[in-house]
Amino acid sequence: RHAGQCGPVRRGNSSAYLHLPRVEKGPFRLNGSRLLLRGTHRHEDHAGVGAAMTEEQMRAEMTLMKEMGVNFIRLGHYQQSDIILSLCDELGILVWEEIPWCRGGLGGEQYQAQAKRMLTNMIHTHYNHPAVIIWGLGNENDWPNDFPEFDKGKIRSFMKELHELAHQSDDSRVTAIRRCDFCKDIVDVYSPSIWAGWYRGCLL
């Protein structure tokens, strides 16, 4: 069942009920009630095995997050294992999943076409996971030094294309980006991601 439709979704012997999340003038609401998102970030990386984690290792990792009080996770900048999405469904951890368009460049036509393919593939593969609430369109797209050309106008134009494509593929969820404040008016959710004391500023 498409995630925009409320009702039961069955996978094997389990079922989950879908409820449409809302972001209205800032606060996040789920089932009509305001919910404070307490989250973390995840890359597919584990000591000794890298990204080749077993299902047991993935379950242990996600269970630990749940025990920490996490109810929201932003996945690393690439489509992750379906096992992780299923664990988030099971554990009640809401998900921001995103594509690997990073660091302020557009590349050529092939690069942009691949970004669009990755976005539609991610949505078509994972839209039936009730845990997913956000499709991420990029990461640190305001970073000027990793590509020979840094053109804010072109980045804004392509961000609009991805935003529209995401809503064409799934109109029940919101889009988001991290950083890139000159595109914050394009997406539905903007994360300034301050990282005080790391990228800028201080801890106090």
What does each model-found stretch correspond to?
Residues 54, 111, 115, 151, ...:
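Residue-level preference for long, well-ordered alpha-helices that form the structural scaffold
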Residues 146, 153-204:
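Extracellular glycoside hydrolase catalytic/binding regions
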Residues 1-4:
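Internal, hydrophobic beta-strand segments that form the core of beta-sheet-rich folds
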Residues 6-145, 160, 175-176:
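Active-site-adjacent substrate/metal-binding segments within catalytic domains
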